[in-house]
Curated annotation (Swiss-Prot):
Catalyzes the ferrous insertion into protoporphyrin IX. It comes from Salmonella typhimurium (strain LT2 / SGSC1412 / ATCC 700720). HAMAP family: Ferrochelatase. This is Ferrochelatase. GO terms for cellular component: cytoplasm. Belongs to the ferrochelatase family. GO terms for molecular function: ferrochelatase activity; metal ion binding. Coiled coil: none annotated. It is an enzyme of class 4 (lyase).
Length: 320
């Protein structure tokens, strides 16, 4: 009897191919066309997206990408490739592919790569620690569409999320402690998660609870008094209410209150990207300091640290 051959698919959001208005426009068009991301009726959304949002936002977002672009590409792609390579090095007999919901390499190219390696079973690990319909749900949807076009469908194990997994919490705690050792213990540790529309949560998305689960476990692991830790939500888009409190407004408030030393961690981002390196490390730093704060440090994402790769090994082990 033939032994089952398993492959691993690491999934993340995606990134433009270049820091140019044209590349950003292509990426944003695909991203903002997904109903999991924006569920506004299409007759209303298409004219707004194509006639207003893409022409106005693409040049502006391209400039932001230019400020963080690395020699090997966008930070998200550089760190995601490092994660893939590090995990593959630890699992020499297991093919590991990288796929993005939007842009390239696509999820379909990752599935094709694994099938070409003759795998019978794919472990899908979306690198979103806290489930949301707009992230993990989008991976699930696209995976279904991809497999619907295949004659040979492999077995699939799909890891929904890992918000309170012990190895994940340990990796976050180690990263925070290293930052405290480097910068001193902050007056407030602010945990900033990507926001979603409040309506999504009202309709059943358990993302807010999964963020609270991560926060609770991390506070316990660090042994910090609860009053020294705050949980906020960033990157809101559009006019409808999103999860609160908002990161930028909270940092402004803390600066105005005279809070001297803030450190910010983004536990929901498995790899540094525009939302962490530009929005949090730069824009929100300015907000805090201009409001009266004294010291601000961003704690990097887990990226390809050994502890993060250990976590991936642990999460996928039951299915390999």
């Amino acid at each position: 009897m033939r032994q089952t051959k398993t492959g691993i698919l690491l999934a993340n959001l995606g990134t433009p191919d270049a820091p140019t208005p044209e590349a950003v426009k292509r990426y944003l068009k695909q991203f903002l066309s997904d109903r999991r991301v924006v569920d506004t009726p299409r007759l209303l959304w298409w004219p707004l997206l194509r006639g207003v949002i893409l022409p106005l936002r693409s040049p502006r977002v391209a400039k932001l990408y230019q400020s963080i672009w690395m020699d090997g590409g966008s930070p998200l792609m550089v760190y995601s490739r490092e994660q893939q390579q590090a995990l593959a090095a630890r699992l020499p007999d297991t093919p590991v592919a990288l796929g993005m919901s939007y842009g390239s390499p696509s999820l379909e190219s990752a599935v094709d790569e694994l099938l070409a390696s003759d795998v019978d079973h794919i472990v899908v690990l979306p690198l979103y620690p806290q489930y949301s319909c707009s992230t993990v749900g989008a991976v699930w949807d696209e995976l279904g569409r991809i497999l619907a076009r295949k004659r040979r469908i492999p077995g699939i194990s799909f890891i929904r999320d890992y918000a309170d997994d012990g190895a994940y919490i340990d990796a976050l705690a180690k990263s925070a402690r290293e930052s405290f050792a480097r910068h001193g213990e902050p007056d407030v540790l602010l945990l900033s998660y990507h926001g979603i529309p409040q309506r999504y949560a009202d309709e059943g998305d358990d993302y807010p609870q999964r963020c609270r689960d991560t926060t609770r476990e991390l506070v316990s692991a660090l042994g910090l008094p609860p009053e020294k830790v705050m949980m906020t939500f960033q990157s809101r888009f559009g006019r409808e209410p999103w999860l609160t409190p908002y990161t930028d407004e909270t940092l402004k408030m803390l600066g105005e209150k005279g809070t001297g030393h803030i450190q910010v961690m983004c536990p929901g981002f498995a790899a540094d990207c525009l939302e962490t390196l530009e929005e949090i490390a730069e824009q929100n730093r300015e907000i805090f300091l201009e409001a009266g704060g004294k010291k601000y440090a961003y704690i990097p994402a887990l990226n390809a640290t050994p502890e993060h790769i250990d976590m991936m090994l642990k999460l996928t082990a039951p299915y390999r």
